Amino acid sequence: MDGWQRAFVLHARPYSETSLLLDFFTEQQGRVRVLAKGARSRRSALKGVLQPFTPLLARWSGRGEVKTLRSAEPVSLGLPLSGLMLYSGLYINELLSRVLDHETDYSKLFYDYLHCLQWLAGATGSPEPALRRFELALLSHLGYGVDFLHCAGSGEPVDDAMTYRYREEKGFTASVLLDRYSFSGRELRALAEGEFPDIDTLRAAKRFTRMALKPYLGGKPLKSHELFRQFLDRRPQASAGVAAARKAGGDGSDGDEGEQ
């Protein structure tokens, strides 16, 4: 890749004494793994540049799975994420690192990611609605198509007052059962619109995205969830934003109250 691409750092880890091994999320090639030689050395021009949430222009070379970074420049200052919003950003970064195929075009998802980060950077309330919308966008880009507005059994439009049960790879069918796989027609409509006007629809969105993402994530837990739990434990008298996140995530259906 000789030209410049817009990119964000999803993950970085030390490599040898002075280098970094990076996962980039790029506008044209999706997730790309890049070796930044000497990036940790004291005199490196890249020192402090290769940070998460900083919009970059980058170029690299190489034909193998791991490319060699040739240059990287910040397009602007890093997006100012802190506290709850920072951990939310780390969560979506880890999601992308875990589920995206290597070097696959996700150009539309790149803008969904950028918009989510921009929302988090300017938000003062709970990040939960933005996270749910991003998860739904991610599932759509992964090819996980679900019709929220029609019963998979009859083809009829969903009724707000009825209950529907989710069946993987089939969709939602009318049901009298009430369990973690059950959703009201009103909740399904909220999922289709990406708008969550109350706690019930927000919790329903979280239940659905947890179920839908599970096959992509496997059994390995997300590190960002553990970091987020530690963050909340350190702040027993949480701010309004943290309290809202706990409330929105507190359905107990998947054992991760207060997580993203």
Swiss-Prot record:
Domain of life: Bacteria
Pfam families attached to this UniProt entry: RecO_C (PF02565), RecO_N (PF11967)
Keywords: DNA damage, DNA recombination, DNA repair
Matches recorded under InterPro entries: ARFGAP/RecO (IPR037278), DNA_rep/recomb_RecO_N (IPR022572), NA-bd_OB-fold (IPR012340), RecO (IPR003717), RecO_C (IPR042242)
One of the GO biological process terms: double-strand break repair
GO cellular component: bacterial nucleoid
Region (Disordered): 239-260
UniProt cross-references to PANTHER family, sorted A to Z: DNA REPAIR PROTEIN RECO
Functional note: Involved in DNA repair and RecF pathway recombination.
Similarity comment: family membership: Belongs to the RecO family.
Protein name in the entry: DNA repair protein RecO
Species annotation: Sodalis glossinidius (strain morsitans)
